[in-house]
Amino acid sequence: MKLKDTLNLGKTAFPMRAGLPTKEPVWQKEWEDAKLYQRRQELNEGKPHFVLHDGPPYANGNIHVGHAMNHISKDIIIRSKSMSGFNAPYIPGWDTHGLPIEQVLAKQGVKRKEMDLVEYLKLCREYALSQVYKQRDDFKRLGMSGDWENLYVTLTPDYEAAQIRVFGEMANKGYIYRGAKPVYWSWSSESALAEAEIEYHDLVSTSLYYANKVKDGKGILDTDTYIVVWTTTPFTITASRGLTVGADIDYVLVQPASETRKFVVAAELLTSLSEKFGWADVQVLATYRGQELNHIVTEHPWDTAVDELVILGDHVTTDSGTGIVHTAPGFGEDDYNVGIANGLEVAVTVDERGIMMANAGPEFEGQFYDKVVPTVIEKLGNLLLAQEEISHSYPFDWRTKKPIIWRAVPQWFASVSKFRQEILDAIDKVKFHTEWGKVRLYNMIRDRGDWVISRQRAWGVPLPIFYAEDGTAIMTAETIEHVAQLFEVHGSSIWWERDAKDLLPEGFTHPGSPNGEFKKETDIMDVWFDSGSSWNGVLVNRPNLTYPADLYLEGSDQYRGWFNSSLITSVANHGVAPYKQILSQGFTLDGKGEKMSKSLGNTIAPSDVEKQFGAEILRLWVTSVDSSNDVRISMDILSQVSETYRKIRNTLRFLIANTSDFNPAQDVVAYDELRSVDKYMTIRFNQLVKTIRDAYADFEFLTIYKALVNFINVDLSAFYLDFAKDVVYIEGAKSLERRQMQTVFYDILVKITKLLTPILPHTAEEIWSYLEFEAEDFVQLSELPEAQTFANQEEVLDTWAAFMDFRGQAQKALEEARNAKVIGKSLEAHLTVYPNEVVKTLLEAVNSNVAQLLIVSDLTIAEGPAPEAALSFEDVAFTVERAAGQVCDRCRRIDPTTAERSYQAVICDHCASIVEENFAEAVAEGFEEK
């Protein structure tokens, strides 16, 4: 036997290298085969519900890192709630209708307009489901736990029927109407868009300054006067029917020396406009308030059949332009509102593809709206005073990335204005985890217009509306419920398969159809109505869920998307928000803080991370950032997170190895019988347990990460485990001192594994497989530990906080001695302490082997004053010299008692007593050489 064999060197097969990329799929299959999600749900049956409702990602392509962050966050919450006494089911969902899928099929060569619509919709459905299953596999690869066999998908018959019923309730309450108001119109998609489908980019546009000649000045202006107008959308002049001024803005009538014409502009802008137009020696002839100009009539710049009326509008400012804007009610919301109020014609001169129509005039017909500037300039002639290129923020179609226009077309609307206050009141009852989130959603609802819910596309849920022979729209409670029942059985494709009369209740009649003939609506619903109905399609319809949900968790862009549409439909139906809490997340940026883009090549695919590091590292990264704001991610950042993971893993591996001979049923030492340092570590660990439990409850992942890493690095690695080897390796295997420390080790190991499970389930299960004495076969079936408190806890903490200060001072003394070449390693030191009464009392209270805690070979607590050479602090001084004696071959301490023993071992008296007591046979025979 060799002397080293008398040491209790930790033994474990738990590997240092995690091998996550290859092992994770194996564990995931094991969990699936063991039906862990279902078993967890069975364990939680009857417990209070916590329902996190999954906002459905769009089913197109593999998931990106933003999806990963969001869904890992959801998984951490679901797992932590499931292990904290809650019934927390997770039903993943997908949004499956809409233009992107139509675009994919078009790229694949599918020609929608050349094939049967039902066949086309079948292709859309097949593609959408293929993407659902692809993304489902992506999410499962992240280690997510959920009901993967009972997903919710917005194209299923039960979901579509639930959506129709949401619409029906809104129609019954009078919230659905048809109008020809201007809406966001995407010529690239040939469809209306909702606000949530708009994103803003900088766009360079041509702005024109031109003049309208006064036709009837109402006794205020002469007919040789011109009113100067500004526009950034020249094509809309073709539909201009008025000029709008601000009622309280001052306007001046001026005569430039270089002009025979007189002009009206905003007084505040005269100087800048004179410079822009090249006017010199400008004479101000009169000043008017805007309201004085009301109802003056001007000529259209070129259309002699059209007069343009001067009207008042609150939206006019003097921030730019001339203080006067032309008004085309068919091409703008403000224009429409003031135009309708003043009886102006709502003219639309652009078709659904962005092409100018015949009513724009023969010179314009057939041109693309954005290419007509030269023609407009030609038509204006000498009425054009200036033109310039401006860069401004402009709305774009979020899918096609093309600019959009406002365009008045007949559409179906949800009248938000009718129940706006009810929505705002509902917001006040929701808990927001960021105050700005509440303000943002509140302001969006307060300021938004009515919701355009119709779309001129094919792939979606049809609007359940019929038309009588006289054109009357029919959407009664009876007809809508009948459609819902048909969809529930056959799916929404039946709308296209059957004639209108076969979709109506049997025997249905209507006074507007004396011949019994009906037509059906061909528009579909906005996809935000699809996902915005999920509270009914999922929360209300699934037996193990609750409505409202406890939590909605999505990206901050969903304040204008899913949070918004879900809120509107839920309040419209039931008067309550569909969620009790909202937690939002920022965007994922690259390592430099730049937006990720395939064109920039700075995207990170979750699959690439899984191959290089493992999903576990991505999960740990999620907790390492404050995801309520935008966060950065790169392979370098993930490499740093991987180092943190390695530190966590190796620390826990040390605990596994050094409790391999510990049976908690037999070897646990009661708290009251622990050494003071072990009590301290137990208390510190339970403080960590409380911090993590509280942070899980508040969804504060970064708090968990920081607390965990700090405990492992500072409390364990830099202190407790730093001197632990001197106990667990050196002392007798069954000695009280070793069992005391192993008790703490095992307690930390078991509980920290449970605490880690929501974040690192793969690693936690791997550790758990080495804990043979724990009852549950999977750690995921256990409960998170409760934080304990202990008698005299604060006193113990105060004592050890003071000792840590003392330890820091001692380490400075050792460092000085090391720099002076007095010692090399700290075990070569004999440390002499010159304490005052406070420190002396402290060291007595610590009641431990202080030399062992400081990792020095010898320590003397001296009486009397410290020598001048001592390193002095306020309460204590130190001197350091080389320890006397010889190095013990077993404990490596320098000890005066170290000597050659009769059994061929050079060891100190302490080690000799351990060896002689525990290894009598080896002592009798003598140890082998090293």
Curated annotation (Swiss-Prot):
Entry cofactors: Zn(2+)
Chain positions recorded as ATP binding sites: K598
EC number: 6.1.1.5
MF-aspect GO terms: aminoacyl-tRNA deacylase activity; ATP binding; isoleucine-tRNA ligase activity; tRNA binding; zinc ion binding
Cell compartment(s), UniProt: Cytoplasm
SUPFAM superfamilies associated with the record: Anticodon-binding domain of a subclass of class I aminoacyl-tRNA synthetases, Nucleotidylyl transferase, ValRS/IleRS/LeuRS editing domain
Entry's Gene Ontology BP terms: isoleucyl-tRNA aminoacylation
An example Gene Ontology CC term for this record: cytosol
Positions occupied by motif 'KMSKS' region: 595-599
Source superkingdom: Bacteria
InterPro entries to which the protein is assigned, alphabetical: aa-tRNA-synth_I_CS (IPR001412), aa-tRNA-synth_Ia (IPR002300), Anticodon_Ile_BEm (IPR033708), Ile-tRNA-ligase (IPR002301), Ile-tRNA-ligase_type1 (IPR023585), Ile-tRNA_ligase (IPR050081), M/V/L/I-tRNA-synth_anticd-bd (IPR013155), Rossmann-like_a/b/a_fold (IPR014729)
Residues in the signal sequence: none
Catalytic activities: tRNA(Ile) + L-isoleucine + ATP = L-isoleucyl-tRNA(Ile) + AMP + diphosphate
Positions with a binding annotation for Zn(2+): C888, C891, C908, C911
Keywords: Aminoacyl-tRNA synthetase, ATP-binding, Cytoplasm, Ligase, Metal-binding, Nucleotide-binding, Protein biosynthesis, Zinc
UniProt-annotated binding residues for L-isoleucyl-5'-AMP: E554
Pfam hit, one: Anticodon_1
Cofactor remark from the record: Binds 1 zinc ion per subunit.
Similarity field: Belongs to the class-I aminoacyl-tRNA synthetase family. IleS type 1 subfamily.
Domain notes: IleRS has two distinct active sites: one for aminoacylation and one for editing. The misactivated valine is translocated from the active site to the editing site, which sterically excludes the correctly activated isoleucine. The single editing site contains two valyl binding pockets, one specific for each substrate (Val-AMP or Val-tRNA(Ile)).
HAMAP family named in the record: Ile_tRNA_synth_type1
Subunit details: Monomer.
Job description of the protein: Catalyzes the attachment of isoleucine to tRNA(Ile). As IleRS can inadvertently accommodate and process structurally similar amino acids such as valine, to avoid such errors it has two additional distinct tRNA(Ile)-dependent editing activities. One activity is designated as 'pretransfer' editing and involves the hydrolysis of activated Val-AMP. The other activity is designated 'posttransfer' editing and involves deacylation of mischarged Val-tRNA(Ile).
PANTHER family: ISOLEUCINE--TRNA LIGASE, MITOCHONDRIAL, SOLEUCYL-TRNA SYNTHETASE
Protein name as annotated: Isoleucine--tRNA ligase
Gene: ileS
